[in-house]
Amino acid sequence: MIRLITLFLIVEGAGLLAQETTAPLQRMPLGASGTLPADTVILAQRAAAAFAKKDWDTARAAYQEMLSLDQENALAWANLGAVQQQAGLAKEAMECFEKSVLYNPGLVQSWNALGLLYSAKGDTYQAMSMFSRAIHEDPEDARAHNYLAITIRSLGWNAAAESELQRAIELNPKFGIAHFNLSLLYMDQKPPSMELAKLHYKKAQSLGVGKDEVLERRLAE
Protein backbone atom coordinates (compact mmCIF):
# COMPACT_ATOMS: atom_id res chain seq x y z
CA MET A 1 0.00 0.00 0.00
CA ILE A 2 1.11 3.56 -0.58
CA ARG A 3 0.25 6.54 1.53
CA LEU A 4 -0.95 10.01 0.75
CA ILE A 5 -1.15 12.86 3.21
CA THR A 6 -4.66 14.20 2.90
CA LEU A 7 -5.60 17.87 2.85
CA PHE A 8 -8.48 18.91 5.08
CA LEU A 9 -9.78 22.47 5.09
CA ILE A 10 -12.87 24.09 6.55
CA VAL A 11 -14.86 25.80 3.81
CA GLU A 12 -17.80 28.09 4.36
CA GLY A 13 -20.26 29.05 1.66
CA ALA A 14 -23.80 30.42 1.82
CA GLY A 15 -24.75 28.63 4.99
CA LEU A 16 -23.03 25.35 4.26
CA LEU A 17 -20.04 24.13 6.20
CA ALA A 18 -17.75 21.36 5.03
CA GLN A 19 -15.75 20.01 7.90
CA GLU A 20 -13.60 16.90 8.08
CA THR A 21 -11.90 15.13 10.93
CA THR A 22 -8.20 15.69 10.42
CA ALA A 23 -6.28 12.54 9.62
CA PRO A 24 -2.67 12.99 8.55
CA LEU A 25 -2.40 9.89 6.39
CA GLN A 26 -4.66 7.98 4.09
CA ARG A 27 -3.98 4.67 2.37
CA MET A 28 -4.37 4.53 -1.39
CA PRO A 29 -4.92 1.45 -3.54
CA LEU A 30 -1.64 0.34 -5.03
CA GLY A 31 -1.44 1.42 -8.63
CA ALA A 32 -4.35 3.85 -8.40
CA SER A 33 -2.18 6.93 -8.06
CA GLY A 34 1.36 5.70 -8.53
CA THR A 35 3.96 5.18 -5.84
CA LEU A 36 6.52 7.29 -4.08
CA PRO A 37 10.04 7.21 -5.55
CA ALA A 38 11.88 3.93 -5.14
CA ASP A 39 14.02 3.38 -2.04
CA THR A 40 12.40 6.22 -0.07
CA VAL A 41 10.74 4.21 2.70
CA ILE A 42 12.79 5.87 5.43
CA LEU A 43 12.09 9.32 3.97
CA ALA A 44 8.37 8.54 3.82
CA GLN A 45 8.38 7.41 7.45
CA ARG A 46 10.26 10.54 8.48
CA ALA A 47 7.79 12.74 6.59
CA ALA A 48 4.77 10.98 8.10
CA ALA A 49 6.14 11.29 11.62
CA ALA A 50 6.94 14.96 11.08
CA PHE A 51 3.48 15.61 9.66
CA ALA A 52 1.87 14.04 12.72
CA LYS A 53 3.96 16.35 14.92
CA LYS A 54 3.20 19.39 12.72
CA ASP A 55 6.91 19.70 12.04
CA TRP A 56 6.39 21.17 8.60
CA ASP A 57 10.06 21.97 7.95
CA THR A 58 11.14 18.36 8.43
CA ALA A 59 8.21 16.98 6.42
CA ARG A 60 8.86 19.48 3.63
CA ALA A 61 12.54 18.58 3.47
CA ALA A 62 11.72 14.87 3.23
CA TYR A 63 9.36 15.30 0.30
CA GLN A 64 11.71 17.71 -1.43
CA GLU A 65 14.44 15.10 -1.13
CA MET A 66 12.09 12.54 -2.69
CA LEU A 67 11.44 14.92 -5.56
CA SER A 68 15.16 15.36 -6.11
CA LEU A 69 15.12 11.63 -6.94
CA ASP A 70 12.04 11.82 -9.15
CA GLN A 71 10.86 15.29 -10.21
CA GLU A 72 7.75 13.88 -11.87
CA ASN A 73 6.43 11.88 -8.93
CA ALA A 74 2.79 12.92 -8.55
CA LEU A 75 2.35 11.43 -5.10
CA ALA A 76 5.38 13.22 -3.67
CA TRP A 77 4.11 16.51 -5.13
CA ALA A 78 0.68 15.89 -3.56
CA ASN A 79 2.19 15.18 -0.17
CA LEU A 80 4.43 18.24 -0.39
CA GLY A 81 1.34 20.27 -1.28
CA ALA A 82 -0.42 19.04 1.85
CA VAL A 83 2.58 20.05 3.95
CA GLN A 84 2.71 23.52 2.38
CA GLN A 85 -1.00 24.03 2.97
CA GLN A 86 -0.78 22.97 6.59
CA ALA A 87 2.14 25.37 7.00
CA GLY A 88 -0.05 28.21 5.75
CA LEU A 89 1.64 28.52 2.37
CA ALA A 90 -1.40 28.44 0.11
CA LYS A 91 0.33 29.65 -3.06
CA GLU A 92 3.11 27.09 -2.72
CA ALA A 93 0.56 24.37 -1.92
CA MET A 94 -1.40 25.17 -5.04
CA GLU A 95 1.72 24.95 -7.18
CA CYS A 96 2.49 21.52 -5.73
CA PHE A 97 -1.01 20.17 -6.33
CA GLU A 98 -0.94 21.51 -9.88
CA LYS A 99 2.32 19.62 -10.45
CA SER A 100 0.70 16.54 -8.96
CA VAL A 101 -2.22 16.48 -11.41
CA LEU A 102 0.08 17.41 -14.27
CA TYR A 103 2.01 14.19 -13.74
CA ASN A 104 -1.00 12.10 -12.71
CA PRO A 105 -4.43 13.52 -13.66
CA GLY A 106 -6.12 10.64 -11.86
CA LEU A 107 -5.04 11.79 -8.40
CA VAL A 108 -8.46 12.82 -7.10
CA GLN A 109 -7.19 14.10 -3.75
CA SER A 110 -5.13 16.73 -5.54
CA TRP A 111 -8.10 17.98 -7.57
CA ASN A 112 -10.12 18.25 -4.35
CA ALA A 113 -7.27 20.07 -2.64
CA LEU A 114 -7.04 22.54 -5.52
CA GLY A 115 -10.78 23.10 -5.32
CA LEU A 116 -10.57 23.86 -1.62
CA LEU A 117 -7.68 26.26 -2.12
CA TYR A 118 -9.47 28.11 -4.93
CA SER A 119 -12.59 28.25 -2.77
CA ALA A 120 -10.59 29.77 0.07
CA LYS A 121 -9.40 32.44 -2.40
CA GLY A 122 -12.98 33.20 -3.37
CA ASP A 123 -12.53 31.85 -6.91
CA THR A 124 -15.82 29.97 -6.97
CA TYR A 125 -15.90 29.00 -10.63
CA GLN A 126 -12.36 27.67 -10.61
CA ALA A 127 -13.15 25.71 -7.45
CA MET A 128 -16.22 24.27 -9.14
CA SER A 129 -14.06 23.23 -12.09
CA MET A 130 -11.60 21.43 -9.80
CA PHE A 131 -14.30 19.50 -7.93
CA SER A 132 -15.99 18.61 -11.21
CA ARG A 133 -12.69 17.24 -12.50
CA ALA A 134 -12.30 15.19 -9.32
CA ILE A 135 -15.73 13.67 -9.95
CA HIS A 136 -14.80 13.02 -13.57
CA GLU A 137 -11.74 11.08 -12.40
CA ASP A 138 -13.71 9.21 -9.73
CA PRO A 139 -17.51 9.55 -9.90
CA GLU A 140 -17.77 7.67 -6.60
CA ASP A 141 -15.69 10.10 -4.54
CA ALA A 142 -18.24 11.25 -1.96
CA ARG A 143 -16.08 14.12 -0.68
CA ALA A 144 -15.87 15.67 -4.15
CA HIS A 145 -19.67 15.64 -4.44
CA ASN A 146 -19.93 17.27 -1.00
CA TYR A 147 -17.39 19.96 -1.89
CA LEU A 148 -19.07 20.62 -5.24
CA ALA A 149 -22.40 21.00 -3.44
CA ILE A 150 -20.95 23.67 -1.16
CA THR A 151 -19.49 25.53 -4.11
CA ILE A 152 -22.60 25.56 -6.27
CA ARG A 153 -24.76 26.40 -3.22
CA SER A 154 -22.76 29.61 -2.88
CA LEU A 155 -24.00 30.52 -6.38
CA GLY A 156 -27.60 29.94 -5.34
CA TRP A 157 -27.97 26.69 -7.28
CA ASN A 158 -29.87 24.97 -4.51
CA ALA A 159 -31.41 22.13 -6.51
CA ALA A 160 -28.04 21.14 -7.94
CA ALA A 161 -26.44 21.37 -4.48
CA GLU A 162 -29.16 19.14 -3.04
CA SER A 163 -28.55 16.60 -5.80
CA GLU A 164 -24.80 16.54 -5.12
CA LEU A 165 -25.30 16.09 -1.37
CA GLN A 166 -27.78 13.29 -1.93
CA ARG A 167 -25.25 11.64 -4.23
CA ALA A 168 -22.53 11.98 -1.59
CA ILE A 169 -24.78 10.27 0.96
CA GLU A 170 -25.77 7.59 -1.53
CA LEU A 171 -22.08 6.83 -2.05
CA ASN A 172 -21.28 6.99 1.66
CA PRO A 173 -24.34 6.72 3.95
CA LYS A 174 -22.09 7.35 6.97
CA PHE A 175 -20.84 10.69 5.61
CA GLY A 176 -21.97 12.81 8.56
CA ILE A 177 -20.86 16.16 7.15
CA ALA A 178 -22.92 15.64 4.01
CA HIS A 179 -25.98 14.95 6.18
CA PHE A 180 -25.21 18.12 8.15
CA ASN A 181 -24.86 20.18 4.97
CA LEU A 182 -28.10 18.76 3.62
CA SER A 183 -29.83 19.72 6.87
CA LEU A 184 -28.62 23.30 6.44
CA LEU A 185 -29.78 23.36 2.85
CA TYR A 186 -33.28 22.16 3.77
CA MET A 187 -33.38 24.70 6.60
CA ASP A 188 -32.55 27.53 4.21
CA GLN A 189 -35.27 26.63 1.71
CA LYS A 190 -38.24 28.97 1.44
CA PRO A 191 -40.28 27.72 3.15
CA PRO A 192 -37.90 25.55 5.18
CA SER A 193 -38.28 21.77 4.92
CA MET A 194 -38.23 21.35 8.68
CA GLU A 195 -38.78 17.60 8.89
CA LEU A 196 -36.05 16.83 6.37
CA ALA A 197 -33.72 19.30 8.08
CA LYS A 198 -34.31 17.63 11.45
CA LEU A 199 -33.90 14.16 9.96
CA HIS A 200 -30.51 14.89 8.43
CA TYR A 201 -29.28 16.87 11.43
CA LYS A 202 -30.07 13.96 13.75
CA LYS A 203 -28.37 11.60 11.33
CA ALA A 204 -25.29 13.82 11.24
CA GLN A 205 -25.12 13.82 15.03
CA SER A 206 -25.48 10.05 15.17
CA LEU A 207 -22.47 9.86 12.85
CA GLY A 208 -20.29 11.99 15.11
CA VAL A 209 -20.85 15.52 13.84
CA GLY A 210 -20.86 18.00 16.71
CA LYS A 211 -23.87 20.02 17.81
CA ASP A 212 -24.59 23.32 16.11
CA GLU A 213 -26.33 25.70 18.50
CA VAL A 214 -27.54 28.09 15.80
CA LEU A 215 -29.07 25.31 13.73
CA GLU A 216 -30.63 23.72 16.81
CA ARG A 217 -32.32 27.00 17.74
CA ARG A 218 -33.71 27.32 14.23
CA LEU A 219 -34.94 23.73 14.24
CA ALA A 220 -36.70 24.33 17.56
CA GLU A 221 -38.63 27.37 16.32
PLM segments and residue spans:
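Structural signature of tandem alpha-helical TPR/SEL1-like repeats
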Residues: 52-65, 86-99, 109, 120-133, ...
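Sec-dependent signal peptide recognition
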Residues: 1-7
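Terminal, low-structured helical/coil segments at or just beyond the last alpha-helical repeat
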Residues: 20-32, 180, 184-221
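Alpha-helical segment of the N-proximal tetratricopeptide repeat
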Residues: 38-72, 79-86
